[in-house]
């Protein structure tokens, strides 16, 4: 089934996307499909997206796991700090 997925972007991703956006996705789909769809929306973000992690329900998920519900997705870019 195709559904709308809410995505929240953090940090450097906000240079390329709004803090919150929605994409349409055919479920079930691997989480890497979210990144694929975002690359189509903004190809300039591809390098950064290749290094991002996805979180759902406050837990990181493997990109190969299947997304089966329309729960929100949080896209976390790499960060450094001290």
Model-derived regions: residue spans:
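Ubiquitin-like/PB1-type beta-grasp interaction modules and other compact soluble beta-rich domains
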Residues: 1-81
């Amino acid at each position: 089934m195709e559904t709308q997925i809410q995505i929240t972007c953090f940090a450097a991703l906000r240079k390329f996307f709004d803090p919150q956006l929605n994409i349409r996705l055919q479920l079930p789909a691997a989480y890497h499909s979210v990144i694929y769809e975002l690359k189509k929306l903004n190809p300039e973000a591809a390098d950064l997206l290749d290094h991002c992690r996805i979180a759902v329900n406050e837990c990181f998920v493997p990109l190969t796991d299947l997304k089966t519900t329309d729960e929100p997705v949080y896209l976390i870019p790499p960060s450094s700090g001290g």
